[in-house]
Amino acid sequence: MANHISSEKRIRQTNARRLHNRYYARTARNAVKAFRALTDRTEAEKKYPVLASMLDRLAGKNIIHKNKAANLKSKLARRINTLA
């Protein structure tokens, strides 16, 4: 256990930050799952820019890795092209 006030504060801050980051990572995962479930191309084309922006924001804040965001955006863009 922490012996210094500053280390106790650091633990509190880390836990709060971890919960905050987990919330946004979970939100992004749910958005990606919902996007993959879409079957209408026009609906997917409308939602893609919002989802791509969300992934870019999370990558910029180091909540997800920038390469993971790029890979997800690429796969989702290819998915749009396969929809009829």
Curated annotation (Swiss-Prot):
Keywords: Ribonucleoprotein, Ribosomal protein, RNA-binding, rRNA-binding. The keyword Ribonucleoprotein applies. One of its GO terms (cellular component) is small ribosomal subunit. The keyword RNA-binding applies. InterPro entries: Ribosomal_bS20, Ribosomal_bS20_sf. One of its GO terms (molecular function) is small ribosomal subunit rRNA binding. GO terms for biological process: translation. Gene3D superfamilies: Ribosomal protein S20. SUPFAM superfamilies: Ribosomal protein S20. PANTHER family: 30S RIBOSOMAL PROTEIN S20, SMALL RIBOSOMAL SUBUNIT PROTEIN BS20C. Belongs to the bacterial ribosomal protein bS20 family. Binds directly to 16S ribosomal RNA. This is Small ribosomal subunit protein bS20. It comes from Porphyromonas gingivalis (strain ATCC BAA-308 / W83). The gene is rpsT.
